[in-house]
Amino acid sequence: GFEINTVKVTDYNAAVEAMRAGRADIAWYGGKTYIKAAEIADAEAFAAGVRPGEKNANYFAYFVVKADSQIKSFSEVKGKTLSLNTIGSTSGDLIPQVELSKINLSTTNKKHFKNVFYAGSHDACLLSVLNDQADVCGMSSRNFEARLADNTFRMEQVRIIHRSDPVPPPPLAYSKKISLKDRQKIKKAVLEAHNYGTIGGY
């Protein structure tokens, strides 16, 4: 067996740096961050989570407004205050940026939005809308569903004005600096873990 030590990091880029510097051997990355980790930190994806009862792990980026918002369609976000997750987040930054570009909007163009800010997490992004700090937020459907399930908010409080195309799930990756033998053991343990208990988390 292996002795496991957990390292908490502040953001996605810190997770990449931890593996690059040898402070972390395994990390759960967002899709965008994994590409960077594979390029500079010798990361190799080997698993992705699938929730019980689901056939695939794809999810979406949602654009969410309050139920009583004057914003009725996605194109009406122009000129409003937008909140996102964190820089480097797949469903809370990259995919929202891509979706906005499809309607010729950019978060870096000051003429397109009244204000754009990063809330720091998907949950904080949602709360920024509920607390009237932002008109619209771009966030992960996974977190939206989780907060709905734990009664952080009620569905009648909000509206989803846009949903992205399906997004591949965030991969669990290990460093190629780990021996092949140990990587195979880790992969086997992770892929069989659901046979021995319930796995929670992201």
Which residues are covered by each model-predicted region?
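N-terminal hydrophobic or amphipathic helices and topogenic motifs
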Residues: 1-14, 200-202
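Periplasmic-binding protein-like
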Residues: 47, 52-62, 150-196, 200-202
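Short beta-strand-centered segments that line the small-molecule binding cleft or hinge
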Residues: 25-27, 35-60
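A ligand-binding cleft/hinge motif common to bilobed small-molecule-binding domains
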Residues: 28-42, 96-102, 127-156
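Short helices/loops that flank or line small-molecule/ion binding pockets
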Residues: 8, 13-27, 40-41, 59, ...
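General small-molecule cofactor/ligand-binding pocket signal
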Residues: 5-7, 116-117, 159-161
